[in-house]
Amino acid sequence: MAHIELPAYGWTPRALQRKAWSALEHGCKTVVLAWHRRAGKDEVALHNAAIKAMQRVGNYWHLLPLQEQARKALWESVNPKTGRKRWEDAFPAEIIEHVDNQGMKLTFKNKSTWQLLGSDNYNSLVGTTPVGMTFSEAALGDPAAFAFFRPILLENDGWSLHISSVRGRNHFYNLF
């Protein structure tokens, strides 16, 4: 396989994103980002997952509150700046072995997987073994989802990234 540079397509973090990006690069196990709208929270998360999936073979998940939100916001949505689907900005074709459109799942040539899911249906994921999880729009998601997966991440020496805009004093506010 040819040498592939990640982050893909020359992406670099914006000034606001640099401190968080550094924490992710240095292996922080739990990162919470309470950023304003349009700050690039999912952008950082996608590029982080791409790198982590190449560094360690495992299952990586990106959860939004509802699976349909994940499909619309990240699987089907086209980045107007690049003309690529948002997930394609972080995961170049050269590292992908298979794309499952129905399951919103990528299988990479090194056998890692990355999948978009809804945190509202976390009970359907019993028996799974993620090593990296992003909880996007975490302020709107089911707080029980992270509580459910936290022991699995601890056992697997995994990591979690919680990203959202603050939406009042709720579970995300307390996490932050």
Regions found by a protein language model. Name each.
Residues 1-176:
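Phosphate/NTP-binding elements of NTP-utilizing enzymes
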